[in-house]
């Protein structure tokens, strides 16, 4: 479903494998690292899964979320040149992990943070802001009509990797204005400051919120994030829901913003004017 390939050498992704039998069918994808330095012979060099999610684990299976069980699966697996020995991992109902991958054959947990429960799960993206020692963590909305509300974008203090502390959330579109518009409403993807020719900022954060559109936040003060721009297009033709569903976002080095609709709206190209 997701992969990270930024250094030309290693592919980091969440996926399954024939030799991995989950203790629960919802837990069938885990972190894998593939060495592609010889592209004619890709080779797995490391893997990690949430303890207790594989048959035969010494740990017991993890308790299920009491409200909406989304499972314990690896999602985004981000690795950056600023800290090539770290991997920033969202693990759905398992929460957020900072992993030590200095030895790719033996990934180790350095820190974890998980507010689910009491909050609904589905930790999706973990974006490190290195100059601030801050993580932006999104929990993806996966139910129409806000049935899994609140799905938030968290601001997490990661100065101590083994003791991460939430200090704020990104301001959400007004729930009373959006939750009944149709489709999903809540956090999803972020512009991830991808290495290479892309827009890079630890101050401007771009996020998609389905029927809440694209939102841009000023994070100069992580304790008080502020919304500074938004884009909510009209319902696209032929959409199965009654509103736009802005799904993903990428910002290039020229400050052109690309975002896509989940269903029928296609690609929107926007110019950043802030």
Where do the model's predicted regions map?
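Feature marking well-ordered beta-strand scaffolds used for ligand recognition
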Residues: 1-274
């Amino acid at each position: 479903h997701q992969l990270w390939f930024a250094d030309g050498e290693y592919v980091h992704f969440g996926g399954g494998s024939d030799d991995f039998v989950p203790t629960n069918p919802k837990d069938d994808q885990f972190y894998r690292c593939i060495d592609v330095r010889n592209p004619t012979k890709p080779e797995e060099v490391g893997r990690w899964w949430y303890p207790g999610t594989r048959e035969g684990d010494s740990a017991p299976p993890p308790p299920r979320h009491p409200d909406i069980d989304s499972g314990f699966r690896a999602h985004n697996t981000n690795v950056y040149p600023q800290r090539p020995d770290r991997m920033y991992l969202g693990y759905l109902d398992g929460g957020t992990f900072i992993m030590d991958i200095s030895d790719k054959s033996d990934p180790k947990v350095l820190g974890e943070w998980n507010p689910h429960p009491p909050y609904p799960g589905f930790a999706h993206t973990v974006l490190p802001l290195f100059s601030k020692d801050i993580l932006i963590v999104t929990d993806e909305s996966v139910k129409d009509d806000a049935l899994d509300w609140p799905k938030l974008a968290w601001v997490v203090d990661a100065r101590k990797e083994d003791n991460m502390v939430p200090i704020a959330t990104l301001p959400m579109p007004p729930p009373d204005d959006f939750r009944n518009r149709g489709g999903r409403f809540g956090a999803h993807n972020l512009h991830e400051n991808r290495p290479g020719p892309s827009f890079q900022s630890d101050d401007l954060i771009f996020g998609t919120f389905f029927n809440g559109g694209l939102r841009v936040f000023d994070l100069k003060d992580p304790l008080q994030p502020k919304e500074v721009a938004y884009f909510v297009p009209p319902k696209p033709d032929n959409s199965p829901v009654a509103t736009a569903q802005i799904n993903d976002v990428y910002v290039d080095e020229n400050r052109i913003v690309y975002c896509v609709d989940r269903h029928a709206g296609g690609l929107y190209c926007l110019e950043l004017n802030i």
